[in-house]
Amino acid sequence: NFKNHFDENELKKRIENYTLKIIQIQKLHQAENCYIVASELISGLIHNNLRLQNNLDLMEQFKTVSLLFATMIQDLSQYFNNVYVYTVEGNHSRVVAKKEDSLQGENMDILLPFYLQAKLQNYQNVHIQ
């Protein structure tokens, strides 16, 4: 829109800044564990006009977000004893436009833990719920 520029480069920059802020908080408070609750990570198929405005299709969004999120978790795992990751099924990640027509589980957010468990399986202090 005219007030805000957002693309995958901006997303990467924002996630990197957010990660640095979390690390600063960890250092300040000597936090041992990090808890991440994630939802609404992509713009699904709920509004056709929004879908057409997105510069990445649904699958590219998921791949981009999954890689960036995994990198964030990898970075945080170096500073915390444990990193616990929870994902919550959101409304915007639906794969069906009409909420009434959507079946339980038809949501891209549900795929994220599956991907993260495979990607981060060798990180003993990362726990994907």
State what each model feature region is:
Residues 1-129:
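Extended recognition/assembly regions associated with phosphoester-bond processing machinery
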